[in-house]
Regions:
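A short beta-strand-to-loop transition that corresponds to the Sensor-1 phosphate-sensing loop
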Residues: 115-119
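Short, flexible active-site loop motifs that bind/organize anionic cofactors or intermediates
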Residues: 5, 30, 67, 85, ...
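Conserved small/polar residues in nucleotide/adenosyl-binding loops
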Residues: 124-126
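NAD(P)+-binding Rossmann beta1-loop-alpha1 motif at the extreme N-terminus of oxidoreductases
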Residues: 1-53
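Ligand-binding pocket scaffold of soluble enzyme catalytic domains
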Residues: 111, 121-122
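Rossmann-like NAD(P)-binding element
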Residues: 35, 53-111
Length: 126
């Protein structure tokens, strides 16, 4: 993961927030995407709330929010990223549409990862 510098997290719910915190703890540049700008304030508050626990877990001293950017445009969020962590709702239609959109805007050598736990990848039609 040391070669990965910039990461996009698609979806800023509970799972996405957890990934964002982990990636920030490892000094990655994080592009968070959610279509609702109103969620940004709550997301930053949650990152700050969880940081004392993350400091202990990852042995980090300081949270660097300069590495954090919030986007409401998926195209902008995916621009130039090395790794994409998809964290959308568990729904085949939604995931299929989202993965096709990610494929459209991601750079060719970007790694695409999904936090799906109850869906079969073979049923997500890309």
């Amino acid at each position: 993961m040391s070669q990965i510098k910039t990461i996009a997290v698609i979806g800023t719910g509970v799972i996405g927030t957890g990934w964002i915190i982990r990636f920030l703890a490892h000094n990655k540049i994080v592009h968070a995407y959610d279509k609702d700008i109103k969620l940004k304030k709550n997301l930053i508050a949650e990152i700050k709330r969880a940081w004392p626990y993350s400091k202990k877990l990852f042995n980090k001293k300081k949270l660097n929010l300069k590495n954090f950017k919030y986007f409401t445009s998926i195209e902008e969020a995916l621009s130039g990223v090395d790794f994409i962590q998809e964290c959308a709702t568990e729904n085949y239609v939604l995931k299929t549409k989202l993965m096709n959109t990610i494929g459209k805007y991601a750079k060719l050598n970007a790694i695409i990862s999904s936090s799906s736990s109850g869906l079969l990848l073979s049923l997500i039609h890309i």
